[in-house]
């Protein structure tokens, strides 16, 4: 009896998660996508071949995104040091805390002793008040 060929697009359509080893190497997969893009941009392929290559590239991009998801889940961020001097880590997703980038910048600045920039809506003209004072003195 003949062996069935593997159909990667059918496997990806399933709900089961794949490990990084099953997905392959990110750099190699991304390199494959870049090679396909160069072929498509060259214009040397027929329409049918171009569509087939496009489908392969889309499947490989999905594979790249899955590899990035696996890598992101593995990343942990240093949260501090315990009483015995050992590093304490937290998963990456726990570190965001729902803060905006401006809030994170302000809290980081406070820890470093810097003054956070004023992003208030009161000065929306873009004109510095010192410039206005000097303009009045000129009159």
Curated annotation (Swiss-Prot):
What catalytic activity is recorded? Exonucleolytic cleavage in either 5'- to 3'- or 3'- to 5'-direction to yield nucleoside 5'-phosphates
| Major site of localization recorded for this protein | cytoplasm
Q: What Enzyme Commission number(s) does the record list for this chain? A: 3.1.11.6
Asked if the keyword Transport belongs to this entry, the reply reads no
* Location of the region described as Disordered in the Swiss-Prot/TrEMBL record: 1-26, 82-139
Check the record and name the InterPro entries matching this protein: Exonuc_VII_S, Exonuc_VII_ssu_sf
Q: Where is the composition biased (Acidic residues)?
A: 130-139
Subcellular location as annotated: Cytoplasm
Keyword Nuclease belongs to the record: yes
GO biological process annotations for this chain's record?
A: DNA catabolic process
The record's GO molecular-function terms, alphabetically, read: exodeoxyribonuclease VII activity
According to its record, what are the GO cellular component terms? cytosol; exodeoxyribonuclease VII complex
Instruction: Tell me where on the tree of life, at the top rank, the source sits.
Output: Bacteria
> Which key words are in the record?
Cytoplasm, Exonuclease, Hydrolase, Nuclease
What SUPFAM superfamilies does the entry give? XseB-like
What's the stated role of this polypeptide? Bidirectionally degrades single-stranded DNA into large acid-insoluble oligonucleotides, which are then degraded further into small acid-soluble oligonucleotides.
Subunit info?
Heterooligomer composed of large and small subunits.
The family classification in the record reads: Belongs to the XseB family.
Record-linked HAMAP family: Exonuc_7_S
Could you identify this protein by its name?
A: Exodeoxyribonuclease 7 small subunit
Q: Which organism is it from?
A: Rhodopirellula baltica (strain DSM 10527 / NCIMB 13988 / SH1)
**What is the gene called?**
xseB
